[in-house]
């Protein structure tokens, strides 16, 4: 973990991501992360469903030109139904925002989540109770 950036998200939001991933399983899910960056922390405060997203077996796609011009978007989250929480080259090539969060099957705990920067370096995740 060469980057000292920490990503924080509430347990409630993380549970919402897990629930969405479980409902679409075995298809991938994709959401936008809204929040704020301050010093060494990105705090995720909301989830946004992207317009015209397509959820498929082994992929999730959306027209990036349709994303809202909203500077409060700090990144994206998507699921890997295989359980592998490492980013693929496609994931990194379609990086949007400051962070990429990946949730993997069985979508049950913080052990099924990883967060990365645009270089593919893993970031620290803090799950809060707020």
What are these regions (language model features)?
Residues 1-73, 81-130:
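Conserved beta-strand-loop surface patch within small alpha/beta domains used
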Residues 76:
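Conserved, mostly hydrophobic/aromatic
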């Amino acid at each position: 973990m060469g980057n000292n950036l920490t990503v924080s998200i509430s347990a409630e939001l993380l549970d919402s991501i897990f629930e969405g991933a479980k409902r679409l399983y075995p298809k991938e899910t994709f959401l936008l992360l809204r929040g704020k960056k301050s010093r060494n922390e990105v705090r995720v405060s909301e989830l946004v469903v992207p317009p015209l997203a397509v959820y498929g077996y082994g992929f999730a796609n959306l027209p990036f030109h349709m994303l809202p011009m909203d500077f409060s978007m700090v990144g994206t989250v998507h699921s890997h139904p295989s359980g592998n929480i490492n980013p693929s080259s496609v994931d990194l090539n379609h990086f949007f925002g400051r962070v990429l969060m990946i949730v993997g099957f069985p979508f049950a705990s913080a052990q099924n989540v990883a967060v990365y920067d645009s270089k593919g370096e893993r970031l620290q995740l803090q799950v809060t109770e707020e």
